[in-house]
Amino acid sequence: MGSSSSSSVVLLLLLLSSLSIALACNKALCASDVSKCLIQELCQCRPADGNCSCCKECMLCLGSLWEECCDCVGMCNPRSMSESPATGRSTVEDLFQPIPSLFRALTEGDAPTHTLVLTLPLAEELQYQHNLHNYLETLHNTQHNNTTSVPENSIHSSYHTQDKQCTVVYFDECVSIRQCKQYCESMGGSKYRWFHNACCQCIGPECVDYGSKSVRCLNCLY
């Protein structure tokens, strides 16, 4: 048993050291979970060689970290990774009990240690959503021979003033999605965005969408 565990640990170290360079494996985020799965011998097969016999078990073992850590066990699709880098993908969620007064108190004045507080106009925050709305409206009109249009009571009609701002907080270091959610809840944030390179953004109560779509974590940019 001891020999098997030692072999798995050695395999883990070799795997992480090689894949972190070739496939941008996030060792800081994935090492613990990948180690557990390798020690249990749940991720030993190689899909690249046509053997995916362990893929389901490995996916279940990594759970919510599968998408971020599958490259550490050689199971990600290289083509999809190159087409959509981790910094271009993110997970967002609304928090159930935001505390706007707490979030404002923590983000006014000097920024909390190891964070970046960023304030952006709502127009900038909503730019992508606005472009998407215009595209969908055009598509809708085309499909209906320009006889109907999407209703204009969209979210943007209420936010055309330039004085409204959206405040977000980035953490300097890479964190897991669970930590990101916990940190943002403890700050009183209303939402969070967790980029798939492990950069965390807490989103304030004035933000209408999900904050900025740019990675700005000082020590977690790639």
Curated annotation (Swiss-Prot):
Disruption phenotype: Morpholino knockdown in embryos exhibits variable outcome. It may result in a weak ventralized phenotype or in dorsalization. Its main location: secreted. It is found in: Secreted. One of its GO terms (cellular component) is extracellular space. The keyword Membrane does not apply. Glycans are attached at N51, N145, N146. Keywords: Developmental protein, Glycoprotein, Secreted, Signal. Residues 1-24 form the signal peptide. One of its GO terms (biological process) is embryonic hemopoiesis. It holds the Pfam family Tsg_N. Expressed uniformly in early embryos. The keyword Zinc-finger does not apply. Involved in dorsal-ventral patterning. Appears to function predominantly as a ventralizing factor, through its actions as a BMP signaling agonist, acting through both chd-dependent and chd-independent mechanisms. May also antagonize BMP signaling, probably via formation of ternary complexes with chd and BMPs, resulting in dorsalization. PANTHER family: TWISTED GASTRULATION PROTEIN HOMOLOG 1-A-RELATED. Belongs to the twisted gastrulation protein family. This is Twisted gastrulation protein homolog 1-B.
